[in-house]
């Protein structure tokens, strides 16, 4: 749980931008814990009555509270019978203020009823302010924006398309603006990745035990576990990317027997998944490029040469007619449908970024995103390069809390070394199967993997290991395929 009612500091409000708290006698206040609402970087000054009793003296310097939907500490260390809290900004949203004595016990002001929204949920202050009770890492952007979609507020995080945050907003609508509320949808998408990976591997290998093995690898992968338990959009786009490649595999497998109504339905579903991936995060565009290469490669191999057409008993003119009809379906499924989904995702922003014109809103946001990702270059202790991800050179620290028991609570994003390091030789073996053994499944996985990794070679913004998430899912499929090839398909073992 987390505080829900908000007290607004407003300079034109009846209370103004200040709060005067009174106590029954003098009390020693060690610190104040402030659960900040949806506006970051709020500035406060605490003060106490001066010795003459005719004014106020500030306690220390102005304090900046950085993190939204998070408990922010304010050091006080003063004995007083009154405490003034002044907001230095035009407005500030505070969901709860908890004053603590030197032993960590809460102190409730005698006039708390004057500011009911700030002191009505004292019981929600946890003994240890870990990630279970507050936002962490990019949740301060994505969860906040999901809540802004729910409440129709001005959208803050506009550096990614809206759909991922819209999905997160569904959890907030049901469970409120709490850690569970903004994380539950991500957990659901993480869970759904397991049956999709099972079905994908089952289709590739036609083996139940190998499909189960691949699904278990995803279950026990640390990055999948972490991203499924935090409120960011990465597991959502990861799910749609995995689904996009799976559905394209089904499409190509079906096209071997010609284009049927079943094939058309699969193409439409494939286009919907691709559109959802793009509308969640731009990394979905890489997957769209990947399935385009896979589709064109398949069509060239099947119809691009006279020998291929002869094998199918098809003349050149018949092949042209067939491909022309297929092209119309592909344009509808892989261009129009994704475009509609992408543009429609901006309806969740309402009129906030435009003048009621969803196309204008979408276009302006594309320019903003492009500018942001071009300019986002900064030093970060957990940043890493694309060639460092596979061997987990630098994990990402999401949250760190020192507990009162002397222990620490840490959330970190990185892969399971057993799985990821095993996937490195599996990658090279898959390339061998593709190039030397002419294995088409291996080729499909290699092209899928390359489409998700190669764009990062040309991106010079600051990046982190979680950008490798989609690649790691494909590498797990490579592990399963290598195992299948080694044990069940290699004629040398029969």
Give, region by region, the residue ranges found by the protein language model.
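Loop-to-helix entry region of an early transmembrane alpha helix in multi-pass inner-membrane enzymes
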Residues: 158-168, 174-195, 227, 231, ...
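Transmembrane-helix signature of polytopic, membrane-embedded enzymes
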Residues: 177, 192, 197-220, 239, ...
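Membrane-interface transmembrane helices that cradle and orient dolichyl/undecaprenyl
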Residues: 205, 244-266, 277, 296-306, ...
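Transmembrane-helix motifs of polytopic, lipid-linked glycan transferases
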Residues: 180, 184-205, 243-247, 425, ...
